[in-house]
Amino acid sequence: KFTMWREQDNQVYYGWKIVAAIFVLLTFPSGLSFYNHAIYLNALAAQPAFTVGSASMSVSIFFLTGGVTGLFVARWVEDYDPRISITAGAIMSFFALCALAYVKTTLQLFLVYGLFGAGFAASSLIPATTLVTRWFRKKRAMALSIASTGLSLGGVILTPLSILMVDSLGFNIAAPLIGVIYLVGVIPVSWIFLRVSPESIGVLP
């Protein structure tokens, strides 16, 4: 029978609070990076310095660097605090989004998107699923499923918001502001609600 309660003290198991926090946290990397590529691509391709081809290639670089970074992140978060990885990734993504407003050459664009991809990998699914796995032995699949739903929510809520910002403010103003939203949406949630492991607060998974 499914229950969120701890039988011994009739309190909600803190792991479910971790799930709720990760649900919220994943909304921002997915909505402001993964689902926003078409927005950024269209805005960049409209600039004289870039073509549709170079803008599209930058998205490929995002996924390439994200994949490579993910290999290192996966090993790192096994031994260290995933919140550090999440924070570092959010900061990298913030700087990448700010830099998108100032890139003038294709090389600069590729470098910025490489940083963006690394930031996405460090701040999203890998550290998040590592935390959920630490907190759940039973009901792990359900916990992971609930937490990862935040990925889809990002596309539903934050992508339309990004379109509105770009259309009303222009890309050069909107991109840094989107970076601020990424930063503010990820870091406070990580440090206020997430905990490294059940043992760190004296409970059993």
Name each region found by the language model.
Residues 146-147, 151-198:
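Helix-loop-helix hairpin linking two adjacent transmembrane segments in secondary transporters
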Residues 17-52, 69-73, 159:
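Extracytoplasmic
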Residues 27, 96, 107-123:
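Hydrophobic core of transmembrane alpha-helices in multi-pass small-molecule transporters
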Residues 44, 122-136:
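Intracellular juxtamembrane helix-capping segments at the cytosolic ends
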Residues 1-25:
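Cytosolic juxtamembrane N-terminal segment immediately preceding the first transmembrane helix
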Residues 62-67, 152-153:
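Short hydrophobic/small-residue motifs within alpha-helical transmembrane segments
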Residues 68-107:
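Conserved MFS/SLC helix-loop-helix module at the cytosolic interface between two early adjacent transmembrane helices
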Residues 90, 94-97, 112-113, 179, ...:
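A generic transmembrane-helix signature of 12-TM secondary carrier transporters
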